[in-house]
Amino acid sequence: MPRRKAAGPPWDAAGPVAAGGGRRRPGAQGGGRRRPRPSGGSSGGSSEEEAPRERRPRDGSPGARRPGRPGGAAAAAPGGPGARGQSVVICEPEHSKERIKLEGSKSRGQLLIFGATNWDLIGRKEVPKQQAAFRNLGQNLWGPHRYGSLGALRVRSVVSGPCAAHSLLITAEGRLWSWGRNEKGQLGHGDTKRVEAPRPIEALSGESIVAAACGRNHTLALTESGAVFAFGENKLGQLGLGNQTDAVPSPTQILYNGQPICKLGCGAEFSMVMDCKGNLYSFGCPEYGQLGHNSDGKFIARAQRIEYDCELLPRRLALFVERTKDGQVLPVPNVVVRDVACGANHTLVLDSQKRVFSWGFGGYGRLGHAEQKDEMVPRLVKLFDFPGRGAAQIYAGYTCSFAVSETGGLFFWGATNTSRESTMYPKAVQDLCGWKIRSLACGKSSVIVAADESTISWGPSPTFGELGYGDHKPKSSTAAQEVKTLDGIYTEQVAMGYSHSLVIARDESEAEQEKLRKLPEYNPRTL
């Protein structure tokens, strides 16, 4: 029998263990540090930050060592050449590791885009000096457009995120394409040059991609065999490579040797991956407790300076809790995770019993616990913990959360408009009562939904076209409205970035193709 890998105590059962069997000291989980900033604001990965203080790796070599093949055989073998100085993530013998073949989305269609396309200006008051040449590229698309360069390319999935100014698409053949902002290499093309229109990621041409996720400046991609590739910003360890390289512009496999991964998600500066057994792992910045390890990673480095201890490798979440009416905190046993969704600084999970847990930054009530307190470990959202009241789908926005119940009702909590009153616990969205929701996505403050034969959106001012209402129509709406510019077009899936929307429009019949041909083409200017 193969030698068993070192196993830690229950709290850290699959957490990193120092090579040679030594438990790492408390307060040094990830070894990463970050520059302080006001604790009340949202994490900002694009601001200028001081390089982390060099720390000596456990193998004694100077500097942060980067292994030759992250996540490869050397890292997997307990006594192999890559075992020294690396963390053991799973505690099971090699022969118990399952082999799986994941399937991507069954939907097929053409990509449509609307919203802001000046990628370097999104979420900023002005374009950074180093991107000044691109200042006048891109525009606000107030209605749906087709990318002229894509022709009739068939797409099965589109991906962005509420913090992201970049986007991804997965073709019907499983190829991953990317475009948008690229200051940290988050497009995976091996450079940091902005890309105006979708372009295939050549480094992943040999892989069949089934899912992907976008953070503020980083990206994760999942292959059909359950392997995860990461690229983009890694200053806070959000790529799971065991180091804090500022940027990794080419796809690199994460340092993980557990069961195959089948779901993933990205927050602003952290990442979540879920294995096929229902275990959840997190890595990146621990601010607000968003990693779920019962700590916000905060420590005082010196006078007037707070830093954060980042998780540089995937670490399993070992504790799920519920709070009783009298304030007792009790562990919830046997949680098997089935889905995960990440907002900017919070996370939702759906388990096998249709329960919802949330944790991270509690501002605006986005966790659904009727209070604004940050949660350091996954906490049960009470509303969905009743027979017949469970959740079937979960979605996380920048400062809000959504869930579709098993009976089809849409529930919302948090805030899309942070200048108005927040919803502190899940409430039914009456405007969408009776609609069968197929797909939902959130931007910074806007929401788009694919339901029945319609596409629906809403969001407060300012908007940049991501609601898709058209050139000569109101640009914002605080109530849900049908997107009339997509009348007669069946939307398979929706995705939303910080202030742009992506839609997969079905093109199976001649009539559907004819409707799509009538939409305007978008051919962005390039330098």
Residues of each region from the PLM?
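Eukaryote-biased RCC1-like beta-propeller repeat architecture
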Residues: 2-527
